[in-house]
Structure formats: structure tokens, C-alpha cells
Amino acid sequence: EVKLVESGGGLVKPGGSLKLSCAASGFTFSSYAMSWVRQTPEKRLEWVASISSGGSTYYPDSVKGRFTISRDNARNILYLQMSSLRSEDTAMYYCAR
């Protein structure tokens, strides 16, 4: 059974920082590209960041330079470091395979 469990969310003031984690299990984590997506208060889904199995990273312009996706293949954890947060970053964040 594939499981992705996010943690690290919370309330942050504009300009603040937050780091999210996603613990993965049930598949060979290191073999898969992984992404973060978010659902806005208006229920719109937005792509936030992706990282390939080899570590290449991809971002939309809206978060480039502010968000950093990374992975720990030894621990099967995906990360999203968010900084310079804005009101428009308010959302529920989810990791995805």
C-alpha cells in the first residue's frame, strides 16, 4: 500500500518560512519523481514543485526562488522548504508521486 504522510504545516506570518515533510512508504521512493501540489481556499489545485529521481528540480514561476524541494532517498522523505511566504501561498499542501 502506497502511503504519503505530510507534516510540518502551520500558521506563518507573511514573509515567514516553513518546512514541510512527506514520509513515503509502500514503493521504491528513490525510483520515482515526486511533487508538491496545493489546494487553495477556493479549491483550485496548483502545482508547486517537482523533483526527479536523480534530483533535478522544477518550479512554476510563482514560487521559484522562494520554495525549495528536496529529497532524502535513504529515509524516504520528501521536503518542501518555503520562505518569503505570501498570502497567496495559503493552501493545503500535498505530496504526490
From Swiss-Prot:
Coiled coil: none annotated. SUPFAM superfamilies: Immunoglobulin. One of its GO terms (biological process) is immunoglobulin mediated immune response. Keywords: Adaptive immunity, Immunity, Immunoglobulin. This is Ig heavy chain V region 914. Residues 1-97 form the Ig-like domain. PROSITE patterns: IG_LIKE. InterPro entries: Ig-like_dom (IPR007110), Ig-like_dom_sf (IPR036179), Ig-like_fold (IPR013783), Ig_V-set (IPR013106), IgHV (IPR050199). This sequence belongs to the VH7183 subfamily. It holds the Pfam family V-set. It comes from the Eukaryota.
